[in-house]
Each structure stands twice: as structure tokens, then as C-alpha cells.
Design a protein with these regions (language model features):
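Active-site helix/loop module of the DD-peptidase/beta-lactamase fold
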Residues: 1-11, 15
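Catalytic loop of the DD-peptidase/beta-lactamase superfamily, centered on the K-T-G motif
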Residues: 18-142
Length: 142
């Protein structure tokens, strides 16, 4: 995977209790969650088309959104490459998160695709089990 150009987000990490942040933008751990490089705008467009039914046939989307329990409280139920996050205000967000050194991301939106959000945090080690939930709650309470 290559990060093209220079106008892109940068990823940072702290290692072994060091106080100094290290730029790890170009490190590659060799796992699948670092294999897709995109822009927030493209991720929002993708989820808008997916969740509005413009990308897949109705039956395919229905199957994708059919979930099974994961046993992981932060994720809840998981479909085919997508999971539902139920916010405290009752809004359900469908999307997916990923992480690689220096980056934690989430992209998704509401069914119908009218409201989507892509989030990037510069660092993948957080003390919060779901670092996106408060951001999602703020955005999807509007």
C-alpha cells in the first residue's frame, strides 16, 4: 500500500512509554486494515451510496445488514463487513472501524445514506474502548 502525494493525514504513536510522538505515517504492519487508503470525502460517498441502496441490490444490502452477536459490547452485532453502533440517543449508525500504527478510523452513517461521517484519529492506541462513540453522538444528535 502506498500513500500518494504529500497532502494527507499523518499518523503518530508513542512507543515504550516515551513522551515524544513518532511519525509512523509510512510504516506498514502488513495487515488488511491498512490496505485501503482513501479520503474522508470518498468514504462518506461510499457509505452514502451503500446505505441508500444505490450500490448493492436490495437483497444484497439486506443480507449485508443481517447481523449476528459478537460478544463485544462496543461493536454489538456484526453483519457482512459492517456493524451497527446504537447511540444513547437511539440513533443507529452502520459502518466499520479500522486501525494501523498512527491511525484509527471509522466511517459510516444512518440507513438511507443521508447522513454519513468519516473520522480519523492520529494514533491507534486509545484508553477508551470506543473512541468514536462521543464523536458520533455529537454529530448524529444534530
Amino acid at each position: 500500500t502506498v500513500i500518494p502525494g504529500t497532502n494527507h493525514a499523518r499518523g503518530y504513536e508513542r512507543y515504550d512509554g516515551e513522551s515524544e510522538l513518532k511519525d509512523v505515517t509510512y510504516s506498514y504492519p502488513g495487515s488488511s486494515d491498512g490496505d485501503m487508503i482513501s479520503t474522508a470525502d470518498d468514504l462518506n460517498k461510499f457509505f452514502s451510496y451503500l446505505l441508500s441502496g444505490k450500490l448493492l441490490k436490495e437483497q444484497q444490502l439486506k443480507q449485508m445488514l443481517t447481523t449476528v452477536p459478537t460478544g463485544i459490547a462496543e461493536i454489538g452485532r456484526y453483519g457482512l463487513g459492517i456493524y451497527e453502533t446504537k447511540l444513547p440517543n437511539g440513533v443507529s449508525i452502520w459502518g466499520h472501524a479500522g486501525a494501523s500504527p498512527g491511525f484509527s478510523t471509522f466511517a459510516g452513517g444512518t440507513l438511507g445514506g443521508k447522513h454519513t461521517l468519516a473520522i480519523n484519529l492520529n494514533g491507534h492506541k486509545t484508553s477508551h474502548s470506543n473512541p468514536f462513540k462521543n464523536i458520533l453522538l455529537a454529530e448524529f444528535s444534530k
